[in-house]
Amino acid sequence: LCQFLLIEFSLSLRRKIFIWQAIVRDQSVSTKGFFCFTKLPNDLSAPCPIFTINFYMVVRIFITGGTFDKEYNEITGQLFFKDTHMHDLLEMGRSKVPVEIRTLMMIDSLEMTNEDRELIVRQCLNCEEEQIVITHGTDTMTETALLLAEKVKGKTIVLTGAMIPIKFGSSDGLFNLGSALAFAQSLPAGVYVAMNGRWFYGNNVRKNKQTGLFEEIS
């Protein structure tokens, strides 16, 4: 049986959108997200209210940099960081997934320190969302995934990135981002890497330096 507790609501011109917390009694699972009701129940304490709902999971997106967000200087030929392309990519991909975006850093993953990784861990632990996507440079993505797998439990965390900068036009970044968002909403709690259209367990994946592809360790 399910009991729905109203915790907050907002109004729009076209419909009422209610943010609810659902508690599944028989599984002792608490899930937060957006529930769009076609009909508001009269009795909120009823064990099984009868109304139609659509559930929209909120995904937290953490930006850390990497090739995914690098800019290209046409004069010098150098790559550099400016602003994240995340908002443009979500619009380009026509994504309707509710997200909360936060930039933690904009660095090459080869420059990422232990302190940077601890910051990522703390942000994942402290955020309210239980579904998280992290954009990350591919060179040390697996190191961060391994640390997250050790320290963060009870959340679905998906790391993804790109081998080619978004600004190059032929980047794999948009495809990888879409995959990561889908995996974050569908996979059980755990840490994963999403690259090349596949997902891997965060503690059992490596980047093949010869092929540029990600693969299982065993």
Language model features: what each stretch is:
Residues 1-12:
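Extreme N-terminal basic, low-complexity initiation segments
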